């Protein structure tokens, strides 16, 4: 059984990557971990005006993210109706890369599938890309799904690496599996 991590920020792009994963592995048993990473600095105080005095901002943020992931899982189960697929929601309140690394280690993740918008020019230099950072800083293979990409047949695949990385058989077998 494959173990796949699906990071999401609930954007259209990340949901597209999740749907791509469902299609790509429709015939294989998989455990899918859907991860959302939250940071307090991501929120503006106006967003939290409705928080009651007994609730903490932290709990409110985590609960909202858990509810959103639960909704995604419900939609996936209904849309794909696949008994081979199992889902678990994970919400973390941490640094994005640290969270990805912790989850991949804890659950022995075989592959990370995530969306990418492909930041260009000055935007890439200043902000970078979450997907690019995951590729650079995580040992687990990453399948980056471009914005709007749908699964048809794979006729092109980019294998990005640097000259310092030595790949093991397990990492390369994921690429072989994807290529069929």
Please identify what each model-predicted range represents.
Residues 7, 90, 115:
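Active-site-adjacent beta-strand anchor residues
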Residues 1, 108-110, 154:
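Local beta-strand N-terminus motif with an aromatic residue
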Residues 53-67:
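A short acidic, glycine-rich active-site loop
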Residues 27, 100-150:
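Gly/Ser-rich helix-loop-strand patches that form or flank binding pockets
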Residues 67, 74-112:
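Structural beta-alpha unit
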Residues 1-55, 156-180:
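Small/aliphatic-rich secondary-structure junction motif
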Residues 33-35, 88-92, 143:
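General small-molecule cofactor/ligand-binding pocket signal
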């Amino acid at each position: 059984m494959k173990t796949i991590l699906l990071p999401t920020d609930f954007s259209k792009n990340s949901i597209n990557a999740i749907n791509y994963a469902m299609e790509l592995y429709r015939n294989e048993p998989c455990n899918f971990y859907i991860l959302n990473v939250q940071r307090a600095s991501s929120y503006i105080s106006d967003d939290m005006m409705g928080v009651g005095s007994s609730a903490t901002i932290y709990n409110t943020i985590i609960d909202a993210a858990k509810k959103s992931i639960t909704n995604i899982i419900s939609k996936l189960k209904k849309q794909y109706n696949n008994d081979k697929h199992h889902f678990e929601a994970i919400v973390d309140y941490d640094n994005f890369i640290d969270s990805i690394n912790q989850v991949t280690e804890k659950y022995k993740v075989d592959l990370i599938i995530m969306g990418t918008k492909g930041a260009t020019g000055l935007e890439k230099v200043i902000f970078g890309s979450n997907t690019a950072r995951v590729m650079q800083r995580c040992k687990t293979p990453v399948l980056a799904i471009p914005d709007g990409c749908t699964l048809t047949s794979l006729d092109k695949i980019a294998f990005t690496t640097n000259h310092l990385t030595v790949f093991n058989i397990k990492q390369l077998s994921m690429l072989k599996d994807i290529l069929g």
